Amino acid sequence: MNMMIKAYKRKLDVANGRIDLSHGAGGRAMGQLIEGIFHKAFDNDWLRAGNDQSAFSVPGGRMVMTTDGYVVSPLFFPGGNIGTLAVHGTINDIAMAGAVPLYLSASFIIEEGFPLVDLERIADSMGAASREAGVPIITGDTKVVERGKADGVFISTAGIGMAPDGLDLRSDAARPGDAVIISGSIGDHGVAVMSKRENLEFDTDIVSDSAALHGLVADMVAAGGAHIRLMRDPTRGGIAATLNEIASQSRVGFRIDEEAIPMKPEVAAACEFLGLDPLNVANEGKLVAVVAPEGADAVLAAIHAHPLGAEAALIGHVVADDNYFVQMVTSFGGGRIVDWLSGEQLPRIC
């Protein structure tokens, strides 16, 4: 029996090997792949048990669940890769409910011919991101498709967390007079991915803002949870899509100030060069919070005190508007309607 186990666990040739169809066929090669890359990267008691599912205990409160898929191109970009993005994005979706993320799952669809060294790099960084966040990946799946039927690797995730009783953040809860706060500069992720995709170089390196926001959210809830109406992470479609979604769901309008919106000069310059509206550009480490006016100062102070919130700003207010428009006062003193993005400005950004 020991000889069989030893033979079964032969090491992968990660440096030179590539994915082939046998790695998804359920046999020895698949076992070697799971042991040699995924279990090594995500190592924890649940995965070591070798079951097709994981059992876990949860604390009191309301359970929150999310699921997401990641198809970003390129797979590696300044500030992260598809693996770190999958961990951070799933954690953030849970955190936007004011919940504490507890567990993740991850499923990989891998194209035949994909280099094992790249898969190991993705898995290792994904494991490191989950450990840094304190949210383990406790179950998963691997499938392999024929060459040309995918683009390297796609990742699907799910996450589970717990929201404390009494905290009910909903996208239909914005009310006229509420403050609109963003936790930092906009557009970093979308521009970082786009510049890598198009092989563009700028005088200053632009890196993705991909980060797990649950620690920041916990500080915000502690400082003024009773006053927070809702939180959203402005990913695809940027803050323009996020504000329009909230306006439609809450049946209100927004009035925001362009000069108050934080944005790095190099990101602004890159957007101008690429012909992008930064309001439509994706973010992966920022949040938008709508807060009752009496709690805005306390929540903003809590964000500023966190390492991920140094550039946070109050950028506008909720207004009564039967048309549910998002209006912006421009830097020139004029006004414009910030509409939904038409078409696809940045495909496969996450």
Curated annotation (Swiss-Prot):
InterPro entries named in the record: HypE, PurM-like_C_dom, PurM-like_C_sf, PurM-like_N, PurM-like_N_sf
Post-translational events: Modified by HypF, which adds a carboxamido group to the thiolate of the C-terminal cysteine, yielding a protein-S-carboxamide. The carboxamido group is then dehydrated by HypE itself to yield a protein-thiocyanate.
The keyword Phosphoprotein is annotated on this UniProt entry: no
Enzyme class: lyase
GO molecular function: lyase activity
Residues modified to S-carbamoylcysteine: C350
Pfam families xrefs: AIRS, AIRS_C
Purpose: Involved in the maturation of [NiFe] hydrogenases. Along with HypF, it catalyzes the synthesis of the CN ligands of the active site iron of [NiFe]-hydrogenases. HypE catalyzes the ATP-dependent dehydration of the carboxamido group attached to its C-terminal cysteine to a cyano group.
Protein name: Carbamoyl dehydratase HypE
